[in-house]
Amino acid sequence: IKIHKTIKNFHNDFLIFFNFFYMIKKSMADKLIVSFEEYIKIVEKLAIEIHKNYKPTVLVGIMRGAAPIIDILSRILKLPIAYIVIQSYIGKGLEDQQGQLMFAREISSLAKEKDFEKILLIDDLSDTGLTLNKSIEWLKGYEPTKRFIKEIKTACLWKKKSSSFEPDFCPIKLDSDPWIVQPTEHYEELSIEEIIKRN
């Protein structure tokens, strides 16, 4: 009986360990960790794709994800920039399940109104597609510039498999839905005190 219990306990312990190991492995597999070098390379590929296929008159970035992308693209393509700020009503990230997004009242930009003729709307990724779809709707109804808009095209660095939105320009189309860990994301877990200590 003791031997039977020992074997049974060992079997249970093994199953617990195996499940734990599987969960860790799956968690790691579900992440796409992107280095600074990889990130810059993807942005450069996006710039080439845009240069070959479209002549926008202004770049509009969705904050915060598009901030570094639009900075680089504006320097390469020599175009004016604008920003729109969005958050979900529940404050838990941009794309909640109900699709409730809250837009800032104004676009932040030094671009002239007439520059909004051919817009390239930029985000870091197409996750569900909700943010890009809603942003297009919002831009079309934005009073100061809507009469100048003739065309809106979209660009992002990654498109996830389950996204319902197909961006016009996108260098990386994924065959899964990983959590994309971008180069600056670790700063969200660091306090200013920790940064001071290591500097």
Region locations from a protein language model:
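PRPP-associated nucleotide enzymes
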Residues: 11, 19-199
